[in-house]
Amino acid sequence: GGAGGRGLAGRYGRSPRPREQQRHRPYLPIREAEDLAAVIHAIGGEAAVVGHSSGAVLALFAAAEGVPMTHLFLSEPPFRFGEGEPSGDLPERLQSLIDDGHADEAVVLFQREAVGLPDPVIEQIRASPMFAALVPLAQSTVYDAVLTRAVSTPTAAMLGVEVPVTILRGEPTVPIL
């Protein structure tokens, strides 16, 4: 069973469009875990799961919630372990910027406060072609901020998952990763 060599990120990755049925419901990490469980069920009931950055936090959270996985690969999960936490109202401030039509400013705020990028790096990103691709995904910054606020330190259930876990950490990377 499992996904084998089929790439699912292109079909099931993040969309720049909000899910209409969830547009007015508050984001909850458990819904993301349920979505992942549905994707795994659709491909045969088991899969090795790879998550990068906040996706790694979500993947481990989902495993702790019982989502069936054969292996878990976590690339640079941004656990803070109680240190250097962003402001508790970051998700609300991000959502307010997006709701007011300032998705670009939400991306910048997220890069500054959640990721911890210095202003010169943010300005380089903003001046690059990559920035235009990030702006339509601004809503995901809210979700990332909610998730990493809820799980800034792995829970006992996350630490006790019973599938093999491989954690990848890059050497030249952002300090929180």
What do the predicted segments below correspond to?
Residues 130-177:
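Conserved serine/cysteine hydrolase catalytic core
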Residues 27-30, 67-68, 90-92:
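Short, hinge-like loop/turn segments at secondary-structure boundaries
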Residues 11-13, 52, 75, 168:
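The conserved SAM/SAH-binding core of class I Rossmann-like methyltransferase domains
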Residues 6, 65, 99-100:
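Charged, alpha-helical scaffolding/interaction elements associated with membrane systems
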Residues 77, 81-129, 142-148:
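Helix-rich cap/lid subdomain of alpha/beta-hydrolase
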Residues 45-84:
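Conserved hydrolase catalytic core segment
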Residues 2-50:
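Active-site loop/oxyanion-hole signature of alpha/beta-hydrolase fold enzymes
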